[in-house]
Amino acid sequence: MAPKGKVGTRGKKQIFEENRETLKFYLRIILGANAIYCLVTLVFFYSSASFWAWLALGFSLAVYGASYHSMSSMARAAFSEDGALMDGGMDLNMEQGMAEHLKDVILLTAIVQVLSCFSLYVWSFWLLAPGRALYLLWVNVLGPWFTADSGTPAPEHNEKRQRRQERRQMKRL
């Protein structure tokens, strides 16, 4: 059963601790996926590792680095001179936030990277990330912009018409 009433807000310290745990968790995912990929592809099958395997590793490292750096900069806390926590940073666990999309990119890259130990064609699944980005761009920015009403005079015209009708009704009474 869901709790009644308003959802409690979280303090700076709790956000700071949760951000630290979230960053640790995603760092473990990154290190684990890279360890599995390097062990299987570049150690066991070193003789058959092609240019594309090395390119995929470089691409995944770039994606991991950019995503993790963005998340850690968003979660950067501010401390006062005496060491007290002034700001816990942005909440990385906030729904529909930018950090949620960065976490999805890290998870997608890790899944694709581990599955690509079996076939390099699995990297085509990474096209889901730009597809999702285009979808979000359309739904949140471009779609509303293209379908927005172009004029505000219409409400003024309707207000005038409504006032006229009210006056006519008053005259009839």
From Swiss-Prot:
Residues 152-173 are annotated as: Disordered. PANTHER family: TRANSMEMBRANE PROTEIN 208 (PTHR13505:SF7). Belongs to the TMEM208 family. It is a multi-pass membrane protein. The gene is TMEM208. InterPro entries: SND2/TMEM208. The chain crosses the membrane at residues 25-45, 51-68, 105-129. The modification N-acetylmethionine is found at M1. GO terms for biological process: autophagy; vacuolar protein processing. This is Transmembrane protein 208. It is found in: Endoplasmic reticulum membrane. May function as a negative regulator of endoplasmic reticulum-stress induced autophagy.
